[in-house]
Every structure is written in C-alpha cells, then in structure tokens.
Amino acid sequence: MCEPRSVHWVAAKHILWYLQGTMDYVLDYRQGDGVRLAGYTDSDWAGCAFDRKSTSGCCFGLGSAVASWFSRKQQSVALSSTNAKYMAASLASCEAIWLCKMLFGLFGQPLRPSVIYCDNQSCIKLTENPVFHDRSKHIGMKYHFIRDYVQKGAVKHEYIPTDEQVADILTKALPRGKHVYFRDKMGVVRNTFLSKREC
C-alpha cells in the first residue's frame, strides 16, 4: 500500500475488531464421527458492484466440522446464476478430488464418492449432462471437466434447499440468525475451556 487512506485504516480496524471478537471460536472435531467428506458449494450472482463478477464459496466437512473452505471471486463474469453456480461447483469438484487424494494418502483407503450439495437444480443437471447445448456453450471449457468426474463417479452433486446451504455464509452477508446457524453447522463453536486471558 503506497498511499494508505482513511478508508484503509477503517477496514484495518474492522478486521482487528473481528479478530478480537472471534478469538474464542474453534473448530469442534468429535471422535467417532468417521471419515465422510461432504461439500457445500454456492455462488452469488454478479455480487461485485464494480465488475459484476460473482463470488464462489465452498466448504468441505470431515465428520463434525469443516476441514477445508474457500471464498473467492470468479475470474469471469457469469451470464446467469446457473453459470455462476456451475463455475463454483467446478471449483468445489477440484477441491473434492484433491481432498480425496490427500485423505487416501493419510488413511490408505479410498473414500466413497464425494457428495457436493448445491442449491441450483439447473446447475446439477448441467453437471450430469455430457451433451453441449445452447445453454452451456458460453461457459468456459475449463469448467466442463466436472462432467467427466461426475460420469466416473468421483463426485456427485445433490440438491439442498437454500435455507440449508452452508456455503451461503462464504458468498454474501447474511442476517445474524442465519450466520449463527451456518457457523454452528460448520462446527465452529465457542471454546469454553479457555478464557481470553489464557490465550
């Protein structure tokens, strides 16, 4: 930052306040939950007011808490919400394949196909349909590898209602009640064993 302004100072203070308010939160992994990888993927559509690009969000749970998550701006402008969700599902599939390979290396046994939950049925149908048609011709070729992995059975996309879409927390600001609900579903809990003074 060669020319920091007051806006940057306000943003930095906001981050510090956030960190201070979340110091007591931890991921709660419980013994005996098993090794089942389940993912959630979501996207807003044209959420950035400057360039109209969408944000992809994805999280993968391993047992009782999330093991991997990301939120990133998409590289191109999506022409529809289905397109934005499809790009997010493609990124989630990459993450699922990588996680499965890593877990195979750790545990030495292959996992069942990863289930990735999406709240857009058109997107799910697009991942299952190997035929290119007018509705999908504008989607970049790099996102279509997802169809190959779905056909091989490496990943499976299933519908989940928007009210249960955990990845929603990674793509947009939510009302407090929804934010707390999704945070709890991700296995993020307040650590009751340590006080702030002990950290």
Predicted regions: what they are:
Residues Y40-T82:
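RNase H-like nuclease fold core
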Residues W17-T41, G108-P110:
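Structured nucleic-acid-interacting core domains from mobile-element enzymes and related host factors
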Residues M1-E3, V35-L37, W45-A49, S68, ...:
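Flexible loop/turn segments at secondary-structure boundaries
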Residues P4-H8, G32-D33, R52, S80-K85:
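Secondary-structure capping and boundary motifs in well-ordered enzyme cores
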Residues G21-Y25, A46, V66-S68, M102-G105:
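Conserved helix-loop functional segments at active or binding sites
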Residues R36, R72-C199:
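RNase H-like nuclease module associated with reverse transcription
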Residues H8, Q20, K53, A92-E95, ...:
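Active-site-proximal structural scaffolding
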Residues M1-V26, P161, I169-T171:
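C-terminal reverse transcriptase regions that engage the nucleic-acid substrate
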